[in-house]
A protein has these predicted regions:
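Polar low-complexity intrinsically disordered regions
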Residues: 1, 66, 204-208
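Serine-dependent carboxylesterase/thioesterase catalytic core
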Residues: 3-11, 15-20, 24-26, 31-131, ...
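C-terminal catalytic-base region of ester-bond hydrolases, centering on the histidine
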Residues: 129-208
């Protein structure tokens, strides 16, 4: 039986935003499942229990942006879940400066909804059994720059430094933007590499 991979989308996005990666995973022989949740109206209180229910059978995870924070929080809240590998795509695991800045603006907190605290606080250092890999981007195209000032390279929404926490099995920076990760062949190659081997192919970081 093929390995299950749960795909988790990010803030303000539908689960269909992960379909491109789902197709690539299925083509590679994986059983891809799209997980959807209400990022603004529902928040982690609803999403984390629903995600945990999907993770009680052996699987891996591919998660974009807020989805990566959500996935690690779910695993940290129930350490025995049989998840082998997690690939995060531009996830602000250290917290998002852009989201924090947006939350301080009039109506900004309402825009982020119940996910505001998750984006602000990020995750604790990773100490779980699953191998977690992070793909960050350094093509600064995105609205995040309007709300927050980034220190160092960023993908337009999340800075590279915001994607680094202790305990990651591997971390790679690719020339892609935050939304570009959703349709990048370069990113897809690295996702498949990590799922298969638990590490990224760093020699291919700049290849098209």
């Amino acid at each position: 039986m093929s390995r299950r991979v749960i795909l988790v989308h990010g803030l303000w996005m539908p689960r269909a935003s992960m379909r491109w990666h789902a197709r690539r995973l299925r083509k590679a022989g994986y059983q891809a499942t799209l997980f959807g949740y209400a990022t603004v109206g529902g928040g982690p209180e609803q999403a984390i229990p629903a995600l945990r229910a999907l993770l009680r059978e052996p699987c891996d995870i591919v998660a974009h942006s807020l989805g990566g924070v959500l996935a690690l929080r779910a695993l940290q809240s129930e350490p025995g879940l049989p998840v082998g590998r997690v690939v995060c795509l531009g996830s602000p695991l250290c917290g998002s400066a852009a989201a924090s800045a947006l939350a301080r603006l009039p109506l900004g907190a309402r825009t982020l909804g119940r996910s505001a605290s998750l984006l602000r606080d990020g995750c604790d250092p990773w100490q779980g059994e699953a191998r977690v890999g992070m793909i960050a981007g350094d093509s600064a195209l995105g609205l995040g720059q309007v709300f927050g000032r980034f220190k160092g390279p960023c993908d337009g929404t999340v800075s590279v430094e915001e994607t680094r926490i202790e305990g990651l099995a591997d971390h790679i920076v690719l020339p892609t933007s935050h939304s570009g990760m959703l349709v990048s062949k370069r990113v897809s190659r690295q996702v498949l590499e990590f799922l298969a081997h638990g590490r990224f192919l760093h020699s291919d970081a700049g290849a098209k």
